[in-house]
Each structure stands twice: as C-alpha cells, then as structure tokens.
Amino acid sequence: MTNNKMVCDLETGICGEAGDETFETIDLNQPQKKVTLYYVTDPICSHCWALEPVLRKFEEQYGQYFELHTVMGGLLESWDGFADVANGIGSPSDVAGHWREVGEYSRMPIDGSLWHDNPVHSSFIPSRVYKIVQQQDEQLARTFLRRAREAVFAFNENIADELVLINIVNQLGLDGEAIVKEAELTKGHELLDQDFAQARSLGVRGFPTIIMVNEENKGVKIVGSRPLEYYVKGLEQILGTTEPLQAQTPASLKKLLEKEGLLFSKEIEVLYDLEQNQVSSFIGAGISSDDYELSEILGEAYIVKK
C-alpha cells in the first residue's frame, strides 16, 4: 500500500487518487469479436515464418477484437513445370539462397540446405495433414503448423516426408500414422481444395496475406510480412474506431513457453519489446532454470520447455 492511497480528500470524498473524473460511465466487458481475420499461408512460406513474432504479438495484444481463421493457400503442388521467374526460382536448389536471405533479415532462423539434397517436393502434403488435424482440434492444428515450420525452417527437415509428419503429429498426442494416411485419402484432398477455393474467393495470390472482414462484409487486405503497425491500423480501420485500440498485456514468458514449447530470441524480443542483449536476463528473471533449456541454432538463441 502506497502513501497516496491513504490520502482522503474532503472535497471529492475519495481516499487515494481521484483521477480526472469523479463520475463517469465505464464498460468492463471485453469487446465482442466483430472481425474475422483470414490468415492465408503455406507451411513452407518463408515470409510466413518471418511473420511469426509479429503475428503472435498481434494476437496476444489485440486478439480480443477478432476471430482468426487459418487458410492454406497452396504454394507448391510439385516441381513439375514450376517456375518463379520473378524470384529466380526454377528448381529446388534455387530456393536455398532465398530462404537464407529471409532468415538472416528476419532473424527467424532458416537453414535451407535441404533444398540441395532432400527438397520438399510438395507443400500440399503437410497442408492436407494440417486440415485433417484441424478436423479434430483447431488449436492442435495451429500447433502442428508451428511444429512443421520449426522442423523445415530451423531444423532442416523435409516436412513432405511421411516419417517426419508422423513424428510431428505423434508429438501432438495424436495417431500420426493414421492421420498422415487419412490426409492422402479423398477427404484430405477435398478439405484442402476448400481452402484453396476460399483463398481464391478472397483474391489472394501471395503469402502471407491477412484479410480482416467486419460484420458489414467490408475488408482490409495486407499482403506480405509487415510490421505490427500495419495490422493494428488495418484492424482500427475495419472496426471504424477513432479511438486507439486497447492492447492487452501479453502472457508471461513462463506461460507462453508452457503453451508453445519453443521460442526463438526474436520472438521474445518482439513480444516483450526487448533488445537482443536483454533477452538472456529477461529469461532468467521470468523462468526457473529447471523449466527450460537454452540452445542456439544458426547464430540465434532459443529456449525449449523441459
């Protein structure tokens, strides 16, 4: 208890700080989610991986205003006839340098050497697994997508490989073999095709694309990996508010690690507004050393829940 809380004003009849108003109407209810946010993405989209720190912060601070729906967009069906002339990509090995460049710029670690010796031959395969997991549990599907991205970008695993996918799904507490097999049946193809149709109806051509739509079916489209301010501004615009949105306090690092299992330094920096050299002490102050392991990959630190 501080001293100013003990001060009682005879004029206002208040013990403590009166503030600007002695009579005002307040609303303690959380705002209803009036906005649908479509996140159109792909498991091997490098700029989607780069967006992870900002997207998490956006959800942590402003998730009370929107309902997020992840939509698979279909980046790579196969290498047969594929060419991205604008980015100089005509074969799998051409992707490696592009990925490393994105990783170095964003500081979300990307190895990329698998494109030389064990390339992902289709992103549709992990996308279909995502859709089957989503049928069982939306949150587990999001966790699957995160684990798949960790595997392919940071740890250089081919997430089109059946055994890799089975292992990722097993770690979710599900039957990996059964789900991966189901994903290749008609149902898996149909579910993914539905996402593709939705992406087309939203006018999406590149990833990541975030589209926010309000109750009047008016929308804002933001293409590419952008700073947090872009998404906040888009949300304010679609809500039609002239007042700044109320940013919620992010979950503690301990709670976040319990939920996520693995966090890279860049993600911690962005979420908690830290400089890179502050991360180590921040982790030490927030989590017991018995609860996490600190490691490094491609020059970037990360923590894993024990």
Where are these regions (language model features)?
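A short beta-strand-turn-helix
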Residues: 18-35
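Short active-site neighborhood of thiol/selenol oxidoreductases, capturing the structured segment around
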Residues: 31-46, 52-55, 68-72
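A short acidic (Asp/Glu
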Residues: 49, 80-83, 221-224
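An acidic- and aromatic-residue-enriched active-site/binding cleft used to recognize and process polar
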Residues: 42, 73-75, 215, 225
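Structural alpha/beta surface segment adjacent to cysteine/selenocysteine redox centers
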Residues: 52-153, 265
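Short, structurally constrained coil/turn elements
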Residues: 31, 62-64, 288
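C-terminal cap of thioredoxin/glutaredoxin-like
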Residues: 4-15, 52-58, 150-306
